[in-house]
Amino acid sequence: MTINIGANVRINRLGLIITVVLLILLYLYSIRESSYYSQLINKDEVSLRNLLAGAYRAAELGGLEVVAVHDNPRYTIESKGKTKEGVNDPVTAADYQSHCAMYHFLSVAFPGVVVISEERSRSCEPAGTPDLQNVADSLENYDTGYDVLVKASDVTVWIDPLDATKEFTENLLDYVTTMVCIAVKGIPIIGVIHKPFDSKLTYWAWADHGASKNFQNIPASKEPKIPILTVSRSHAGRVHNASKVAFGDNVKIVSAAGAGYKCLEVAAGNATAYIHMTNIKKWDVCAGAAIINALGGTVTSLSGEPMIDFGPGDSTVLEHGLLATMEDHKWYLDKFYNL
């Protein structure tokens, strides 16, 4: 009988190599899982990458609630009163259900982080422990660079459970978004905007780290370009008059709803500037400001003040209007400064 010792040695060596590789992979996976869950329960420190994953998932969950309410034709519409422009400010079950889904998901996932929402609800169901790992894994397709750990006390999360509620009630669904913004030491650095009806797309950007792939097809600037201003439907007339003074007839004004929608229009190059001439709430603009800044644009008040006061103790209202651009920001500021 002949024994092929060389073949056995080769087989055993191959088996040993496979075993070692599998053990290494198992070890790396266990470290990752341990790191992930330790960050999830660590109230003192938080991973910005995990926060991005959580914001992404929260925006999607809110969108599912918004769509569910829309599909129920019997939902009720209440009113918060009127805006300064005299426009009714409605609120619906979609606002509240989206708030519950988004707020409790983020609060449970990141217990040491302050979460500020536009809405409050008295009847939110208790939330279970969120599983962010699958969402975090989906971000592997994006080059977000290195992770960053920050003090949880330095982080404020701003959420808008349903932007453009009035248009939601009017079935103008293209304007509707759910939004999450992550501010560190008062500065918006991560923004997530989800469109629950318009192709169900989710847009995000993280300053100095990366952005969602749906921002990769932004057209390059073509000169010369006339100013294309996107403005709120509720006070388009005022901006129209001011714009005529600032630019004469060499301007195009596009009325739209939802601060999130308008910020995305600027980021996509469909508008050269987003102008808002009255006070605006921070949950309306935080995500859009973070995205535009991360993509290389600029967002300030109409008096040029930067977006740096998004901490837990700051006012929820931005005064002195809003200007968002991808380029020529100072030129637009100068045009509107004295109007």
Language-model regions: role of each:
Residues 1-60, 64, 83-84, 244-247, ...:
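Oxyanion/phosphate-interacting regions
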Residues 2-162, 242, 337:
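N-terminal subdomain of lithium-sensitive/metallo-dependent phosphomonoesterases centered on the IMPase/IPPase/PAP
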Residues 28-30, 179-264, 270, 314-339:
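Acidic beta-strand-loop-alpha-helix segment within the catalytic core
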Residues 62, 66, 95, 106, ...:
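Residue-level signal for inorganic ion chemistry
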Residues 140-208:
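DPxDG-like acidic metal-binding loop motif
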